[in-house]
From Swiss-Prot:
InterPro entries to which the protein is assigned, alphabetical: PBDC1-like_dom_sf, PBDC1_metazoa/fungi, Polysacc_synth_dom
Record-given protein name: Protein PBDC1 homolog
Organism: Saccharomyces cerevisiae (strain ATCC 204508 / S288c)
Keyword Cytoplasm among UniProt keywords: yes
Major localization listed first in the record, in broad terms: cytoplasm
Annotated compartments: Cytoplasm
Ranges that cross the membrane: none
Keywords: Cytoplasm
Pfam families registered for this protein in UniProt: PBDC1
Molecular function via GO: misfolded protein binding; nascent polypeptide-associated complex binding; protein folding chaperone; ribosome binding; translation elongation factor binding
Extra facts: Present with 37500 molecules/cell in log phase SD medium.
Family: Belongs to the PBDC1 family.
GO cellular component, one term: cytoplasm
GO biological process, one term: 'de novo' cotranslational protein folding
Length: 146
């Protein structure tokens, strides 16, 4: 059994840079996809409906479309929020490959990825928000953008 503890581990600069490169590449790929296809027509995983239903059930505050559209990074990072998300992750940890990889998420669905509109999250959080945004048509405005 491993004794590695992610909460107390030192971040190695090279590993951090590699994660950042992958996260940026994923964000660029997703944005390019959204410029070509309305988000409301996309499926991000074969578990989209299950992710959405569990997200709405466990985080009922996001049934308010405005909260899905725009949120603050801080509301995802509180001690209570982290615990709620950990419980959400356990549902999908054996179903979604790389569910816990770092990913960039826009904090505002009406904006592009940018310095003040992007946060670093776990991929399953990205899926939860973006699937909800897509179901509500919040990303459809992006089609045709550059």
């Amino acid at each position: 059994m491993s004794t590695f503890n992610a909460e107390t581990a030192d971040n190695l600069e090279d590993i951090e840079k590699q994660f950042a490169v992958v996260a940026v590449e994923q964000a660029e790929t997703y944005w390019k996809l959204l410029t070509s296809v309305p988000g409301s027509k996309l499926r991000l995983t074969k578990f989209d409906d299950e992710i959405y239903e569990n997200f709405m059930e466990r985080f009922p505050e996001y049934k308010d479309v405005e909260r899905v559209k725009k949120f603050t990074e801080e509301e995802l990072k509180t001690k209570e929020a982290k615990e709620r998300w950990r419980k959400f992750f356990t549902i999908f940890e054996k179903k979604i490959e790389d569910y816990n990889f770092g990913t960039l998420l826009r904090t505002d669905a009406s904006a592009e990825y940018g310095q003040f509109t992007t946060c670093f999250v776990v991929r399953l959080q990205f899926y939860a928000f973006e699937i909800a945004r897509n179901k509500h048509g919040l990303n459809d405005w992006i089609v045709g953008q550059k």
